[in-house]
Amino acid sequence: LEGRLAQVFVNLISNAISFCEEGDAIRVWVRKRENRVLVVIEDTGPGIPEDALQKVFQRFYSERPETQFGDNSGLGLAISKQIVEAHGGVIWAENIRPTDADIGSEPLGARFVVGLPV
């Protein structure tokens, strides 16, 4: 089971790469918070439609603009969620915005956070 966590991070980073254009930045960082470690993957792609933020973790969810970003089976994030939860962790997605109060603005990219117990 431990080796499967690598699959999660490879999937999240691969997704970030597929949604960015040549030369765009992808950030990966780790922070310890209380009894968890947070692993954060951020991209500078188009972000995620607000109504899709929870749906992206459903099996075969495909109502994303994959046609312009390459093929997608709709399984990667669902499998990642199962693996993270099997380790007692959580995973979520959010959009990066200029400020937290600026909900109406266009996203500056997407952020995926994996929280795992330490």
What are these regions, as identified by a protein language model?
Residues 61-71, 100-101:
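Glycine-rich ATP-lid/hinge loop adjacent to the conserved G-boxes
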Residues 48-60:
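Short conserved segment of the HATPase_c
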Residues 23-35:
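Short beta-strand/loop element within the Bergerat-fold HATPase_c
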Residues 43:
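Acidic ATP/Mg2+-coordinating residue in the GHKL
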Residues 76, 80:
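Short alpha-helical Gxxx[C/S/T] motif in the catalytic ATP-binding
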Residues 16-17:
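Short helix-loop "hinge" at the ATP-lid/N-box region of the Bergerat-fold HATPase_c
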